[in-house]
Amino acid sequence: MENSLKIKDIPKNERPKEKLLSYGADTLNNSELLAIILRTGTKGENVLQLSNRLLSEFQGLDGILEASLDDITSIKGIKEGKASQILALAELFRRFRTFKSADRDIKIMSPNDIAMLINGEMSLLKQEILKVIFLNTKNIVIGTKDVFKGSLNTSIVHPREIFKEAVNKSSTKIIICHNHPSGDPTPSKEDINITLRIKECGEIMGIQLLDHIIIGKNGFISLKEKGFI
């Protein structure tokens, strides 16, 4: 039966590891790459079949990278060992996207530049986070910081925390960004109120709020482009 087919029964040049070594990682599909990470299958299922099932259950690689420990271990045959391998892969991906951008000066010229900087990291988050990007007079990024976690509202978002960090970094401009775990980046009334409050405080302190970017699953919205800044 196909379900009992073992990796060793697959022609050697079609096995993920051998294929990678012979032809390069870029020749492998997502299922084959995931199979190399997982290394082994489960009872009655080889590692390629397991990888295909995971990709199907989570509707693609994005879904796997967004999954929590409970999400992954709820899948039949997946224990904490394999779940930890997947979670480690997801964390490496997030860190790569963050640290890659730190290797060079980044100049912000448009909302697209902001989205390119943070989208890979923030679009995968399941908890709402407010991130601040600090810039110098030339719009070069000089730092970022997550300042709030959880549902955002004007009662918990304190501008002093944002501007204290901006002053410490000698930042003359800031951009605030947060994600909507629902996937819909449409700004809420609270999002707009928070934006206006931070903008007003910035004007008093001489630190300009350039934009507020809201990240969704498949896109983003710039409150500056929408006319709120």
UniProtKB/Swiss-Prot annotation:
Keyword set includes Disulfide bond: no
Domain MPN: 107-229
Gene Ontology BP terms: proteolysis
Molecular function via GO: metal ion binding; metallopeptidase activity
Hydrolase keyword on record: yes
PROSITE patterns named in the record: MPN, UPF0758
InterPro entries reported in the protein's UniProt record: MPN (IPR037518), RadC_JAB (IPR025657), RuvA_2-like (IPR010994), UPF0758 (IPR001405), UPF0758_CS (IPR020891), UPF0758_N (IPR046778)
Keywords in alphabetical order: Hydrolase, Metal-binding, Metalloprotease, Protease, Zinc
SUPFAM superfamilies for the chain: JAB1/MPN domain (SSF102712), RuvA domain 2-like (SSF47781)
Residues bound to Zn(2+): 178, 180, 191
Residue interval(s) of motif JAMM motif: 178-191
Transmembrane segments: none
Homology family: Belongs to the UPF0758 family.
NCBIfam families found in the cross-reference section: PRK00024.1 (NF000642), radc (TIGR00608)
Protein name per the record: UPF0758 protein CLH_0547
Taxonomic placement: Bacteria, Bacillati, Bacillota, Clostridia, Eubacteriales
